[in-house]
């Protein structure tokens, strides 16, 4: 019995090897990923069915309790019983692809066994679809893994050969011959089939683990390299930056050489051949030009593809990886090797992954840069906005003063020019020192005092050491203008406006107080949050909204405006970060 078991293992080993080789083909990955369709079932049923037919031909033939060994069984006589190994392949198909694939493979094997004939052809043909169907169902019931565990496979593999022996006992015309066959080959067949199924699942699981671990290591390697390259990608492009990048990649990838190019020229070359592969040279390789044009990775497997004019150049092969920015190829990373054998599937996958990650980072940085420019442009637009009514009223005031007080008109005109000049200047800056903001405000207040002499009193309280803190430009003047236009100018008593700038903990608090009419209570929750739908006389809240949006965008949510009414008028308050204000932009 031991000798028979060894013989059966030898025959089954060939089938296991063939089945394992099949699973390494990329098309068979759909079985492991459980992506089963009708087309998949038909295709793989034919493939596994072909292997199961081979399993039938390399089986053994029995006459009674006598075992006949043949290298390849061609036909089976009526007095002979075929004990094939097609059932092993059918069980493998069922475990990998489920009951339908197992059934399909079993039907192919069963139909072929009918043509082989023999005394037990009914049992032999029937066991194959039954084994495939039952193994597939059992595999789905007992395991949700991509590949069943070996222990479960061992358990499931016991039942199909037992069922096979039962069918032979029932369907063989001569019951005595059936008993002799089962006694002779029953136990060895159960042992070999179940262990074969176990060995196959172990082989698949080990191969998958190795592949996934290798992929994880290469992915981690690519991510690590990309992370180290990120600071260089943030810098302005140029030959110096390209050389830094080439040195980094050369160190991390452990290859013969590396070059970085733009669309037409070599920017940097590090490693072997740097004595004749010089920066500034035009792209020579046909494959490099093809990679730039088509945007797909190219591989030079032969030294002739590198097209180097130096006879003894040690660079034999290369991978050319296109780098994208916003969907357009901007250059290449060329990875050079000493031998073509070094360009493995792992190296190609790493090169592709590295190119994709670097391209995504470059595109992300470009998008972030454009977003920042758009944000800055929006801020400039908000900062440069001037209330047209203020200009019209000031021009009207100057026109009126020219008749009665030309000197005062000249003074107001000078203040207006300073105000306008400051307004244009701050449009180019994100943050300005507080003293410049106060100068801008003072120019505005000079004009206001001329318009409302002895009607409005303003005072500003600030410590000298706070004059250098930074503040978004055109913040105080619109707040003061809003207070005067919608509060103080409508008051019957003399208007008083006070600005207090004080340090509190790590912040600078700026508070504007006035004794005007205050804000409508229903508007307080939304002031500064969005523009209002008001008529021209009541205002639309654009000024407060613009200021609040700039404060939030530049300094964060903590610096937003807080607006409330007081017993004597209204109060507008916000804070500036004291220690970090110069590091915001």
From Swiss-Prot:
Subcellular locations according to the entry: Cell membrane
Residues modified as Phosphohistidine: 389
Cellular component annotations (GO), alphabetically ordered: plasma membrane
Matches recorded under SUPFAM superfamilies: ATPase domain of HSP90 chaperone/DNA topoisomerase II/histidine kinase, GAF domain-like
GO BP of this protein: cell wall organization
First-tier enzyme category under EC: transferase
GO molecular function, one term: ATP binding
Coiled-coil regions, chain positions: none
Transferase recorded as keyword: yes
Protein name: Sensor protein LytS
Gene from which the chain derives: lytS
């Amino acid at each position: 019995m031991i000798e028979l078991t060894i013989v059966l293992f030898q025959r089954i080993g060939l089938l296991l090897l063939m089945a394992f080789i099949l699973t390494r083909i990329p098309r068979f990955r759909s079985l492991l990923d459980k992506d089963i369709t009708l087309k998949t079932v038909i295709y793989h049923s034919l493939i596994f069915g072909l292997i199961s037919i081979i399993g039938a031909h390399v089986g053994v033939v029995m006459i009674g309790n006598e075992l006949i060994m043949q290298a390849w069984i061609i036909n089976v006589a009526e007095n002979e019983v075929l004990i094939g190994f097609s059932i092993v392949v059918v069980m493998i198909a069922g475990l990998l692809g489920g009951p339908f694939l197992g059934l399909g493979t079993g039907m192919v094997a069963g139909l072929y066994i009918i043509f082989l004939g023999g005394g037990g052809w009914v049992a032999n043909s029937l066991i194959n679809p039954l084994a495939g169907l039952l193994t597939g169902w059992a595999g789905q019931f007992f395991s949700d893994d991509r590949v069943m565990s070996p222990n479960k496979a061992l358990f499931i593999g016991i039942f199909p050969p037992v069922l096979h022996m039962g069918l032979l006992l029932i369907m063989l015309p001569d019951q005595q011959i059936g008993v002799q066959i089962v006694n002779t080959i029953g136990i060895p067949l159960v042992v070999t089939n179940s262990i074969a199924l176990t060995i196959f699942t172990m082989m698949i699981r080990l191969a998958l683990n190795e592949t996934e671990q290798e992929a994880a290591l290469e992915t981690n390697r690519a991510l690590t390299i990309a992370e180290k390259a990120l600071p260089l990608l943030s810098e302005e492009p140029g030959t110096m930056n390209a050389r830094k990048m080439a040195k980094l990649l050369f160190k991390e990838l452990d290859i013969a050489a590396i070059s970085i190019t733009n669309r037409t020229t070599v920017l940097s070359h590090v490693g072997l051949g740097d004595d004749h592969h010089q920066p500034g040279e035009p792209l020579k390789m046909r494959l490099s030009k093809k990679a730039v044009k088509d945007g797909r990775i190219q591989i030079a497997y032969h030294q002739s593809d590198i097209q180097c004019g130096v006879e003894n150049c040690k660079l034999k092969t290369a991978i050319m990886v296109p780098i994208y920015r916003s969907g357009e190829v901007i250059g290449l990373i060329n990875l050079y090797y000493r031998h073509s054998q070094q360009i493995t599937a792992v190296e190609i996958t790493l090169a592709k992954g590295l190119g994709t990650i670097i391209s995504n980072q470059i595109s992300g940085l470009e998008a972030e840069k454009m977003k920042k420019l758009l944000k800055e442009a929006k801020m400039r637009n908000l900062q440069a906005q001037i209330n047209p009514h203020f200009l019209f009223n000031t021009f009207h005031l100057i026109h009126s003063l020219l008749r009665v007080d030309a000197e005062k008109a000249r003074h107001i005109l000078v203040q207006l020019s300073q105000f306008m000049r400051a307004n244009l200047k701050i449009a180019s800056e994100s943050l300005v020192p507080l003293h410049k903001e106060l100068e801008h405000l003072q120019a505005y207040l000079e004009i206001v005092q001329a318009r409302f002499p002895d009607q409005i009193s303003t005072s500003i309280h600030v410590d000298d050491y706070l004059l250098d803190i930074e503040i978004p430009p055109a913040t105080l003047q619109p707040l003061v203008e809003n207070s005067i236009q919608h509060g103080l100018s409508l008051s019957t008593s003399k208007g008083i406006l006070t600005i207090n700038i004080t340090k509190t903990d790590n912040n600078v608090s700026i508070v504007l107080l006035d004794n005007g009419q205050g804000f409508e209570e229903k508007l307080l929750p939304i002031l500064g949050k969005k523009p209002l739908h008001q008529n021209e006389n009541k205002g639309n809240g654009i000024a407060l909204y613009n200021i609040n949006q700039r404060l939030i965008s530049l300094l964060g949510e903590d610096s937003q405006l807080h607006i409330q009414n007081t017993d004597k008028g209204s109060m507008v308050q916000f804070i500036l970060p004291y220690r970090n204000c110069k590091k915001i932009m």
